């Protein structure tokens, strides 16, 4: 089977990662003890057919997540272990330090994290060796802190060195000004993005601001907690990985998804979305129709990144529908969306919307859909972080925390310009048209005549 090794680093990464395991264990009929208790025979086949993508089968028929949990302080690990699904993970999967990274990217990447990284790689190597045919890695982390961002990107580059031909996929929580934990988030995020541009194949940008907006506006929650935000993230992660976990034809592994979604290697930052949005613990009373799902899924309010897709154009889109529904209706709806909103899709990539359907819906809903868009509007997110970075870096504010760990100012300048380049690349393709090439050729000919 095509296995995926899952890594989670830092407090945020461990919390959304653990929530992800809770949800997919539930979908595959796996108890917190690791035992399989399926319902009927038909469902059992579906649940277990591709269970090996995320789980190892241990002794006594127990299923163990192929996960590596990493942090530079023991706190989050202890709460995962004490939580309802703590017994699911095997003890060797927990790798932690004692000192913490103190929201400092340099500590995570160069000092504290670098000391721990070899023991993490040992666990990763052991997991990879047990695989029949490893397809790649997925990492959950945040870009605003120290461990997830600094050590997360260090792990990514080390794994890239050791497994250069495997796909690297990250779920990255991007900081936002409205929901800020630390003042140095723009530094940590910019230094991380500098790494992610070069070393990952697919990055899902999840944005706290967008998640808060969804909680306020759509779910009508008065004071949302991180638990509510993580619930939204895990719904999306479960949806995005549906194609890998259940039998299906489209985007059935990380590489196929990358081939469909990434037109240029640097532009691999995706905007995820989900429909229907429901609050934790609430059940939906009315089943949505396929047109409603499609409508909601493309709506800016349902995006998990705080960018407005109407301000850019889609390079590529993947949609995953879940539940029992007519394939014909799904295709018609997706076709309609492209026709009615053709100006929002670049015309120089024909057929740039791919759709997959999986029979098994998420728990408690009849039908759901997940959206993955590679939109040029994501440059708004990078621009926002870049502006905050520049404001502080111009005054060299807080820089001594980083140079004290042995970093050089030059590295900040490089990260800043790499992010600015990324923004202008997205803008360039947003304005590109299918006729650009032809225009250049004509100009060349005209010059030739006068020569």
From Swiss-Prot:
Q: Which InterPro entries match?
A: Beta-tubulin_BS (IPR013838), Beta_tubulin (IPR002453), Tub_FtsZ_C (IPR008280), Tubulin (IPR000217), Tubulin/FtsZ-like_C (IPR037103), Tubulin/FtsZ_2-layer-sand-dom (IPR018316), Tubulin/FtsZ_GTPase_sf (IPR036525), Tubulin_C (IPR023123)
Q: Where does Mg(2+) bind?
A: 73
Q: Name one GO biological process term.
A: microtubule-based process
Q: What is this protein called?
A: Tubulin beta-1 chain
Q: Which PROSITE patterns match?
A: TUBULIN (PS00227), TUBULIN_B_AUTOREG (PS00228)
Name the coenzymes or cofactors required.
Mg(2+)
Composition-biased stretches (Acidic residues): 433-451
